[in-house]
Amino acid sequence: MMDLKTKAFDISQNFTISLDGPAASGKGTIGLMLAKKFSLKYFQSSIVYRQLTFDCISQKIDITDIDAVIALSKRLKLDNNLDLENENIGDIASQIAVISEVRNNLNKYLINLVKTTPRIIMEGRDIGTVVAPDADLKIFITANPDIRAERRYKQLQAKGKACILDEILQQIILRDKRDKERKVAPLLPASDALIIDTSKLSAIEVVEEITHYMQIIK
């Protein structure tokens, strides 16, 4: 039996990676690097929640109107031309994500995407536990909240977006609380996931650690 690294490099093989972790833990950068390294499609599951949030705002649907939000989640269509990387949208999306019916509806979309995409790395909060429990490789990325807030602050500044570091930190702490305490698919690593704390590691070092792990797992 071939090791995971060999299988991942073989583009004739189906290969799925689940990449979970809290906000601003470095998942995006690491996910893109792994996708490029192994020629995988990269998909952020948070996009479906951000799209739903954008749709609620544009259609003037109050997120406290649970029935309306649930109904909208059943007919989600992604618009790849939108810029959904907005802290306000992200904060509202994390509130919508705790609605169990919404999460179930959007997870159906994500599960179908994984099943119909032969080679994919999907990033999110519950990919390894719910969306792709049979993934070839499951990774859980974490980091200190202060480090994560600083990373997000620098990302937003680089994009020319106004932001305040302390506000970002408070949003991250609140999002962590919501993610960990929600009744449906709370944020936690799969029992067989590789867990990496990126607080003191560069993205390159993390990818190297993952690649080494893949060499010894079959």
UniProtKB/Swiss-Prot annotation:
EC top class named in words: transferase
Transmembrane portions of the chain: none
Subcellular location: Cytoplasm
Keyword terms of this UniProt record: ATP-binding, Cytoplasm, Kinase, Nucleotide-binding, Transferase
Coiled-coil segments: none
Tagged with keyword Manganese: no
UniProt keyword rRNA processing, yes or no: no
Gene3D superfamilies: P-loop containing nucleotide triphosphate hydrolases
Reaction(s) this enzyme catalyzes, per UniProt: CMP + ATP = CDP + ADP; dCMP + ATP = dCDP + ADP
Gene Ontology terms for molecular function: ATP binding; CMP kinase activity; dCMP kinase activity
Pfam families membership: Cytidylate_kin (PF02224)
Recorded superkingdom: Bacteria
Enzyme Commission number(s): 2.7.4.25
Residues involved in ATP binding: 21-29
One Gene Ontology term, aspect cellular component: cytoplasm
Alphabetized InterPro entries for the sequence: Cytidylate_kin (IPR003136), Cytidylate_kinase_dom (IPR011994), P-loop_NTPase (IPR027417)
GO biological process annotation, one example: pyrimidine nucleotide metabolic process
Family: Belongs to the cytidylate kinase family. Type 1 subfamily.
Protein name: Cytidylate kinase
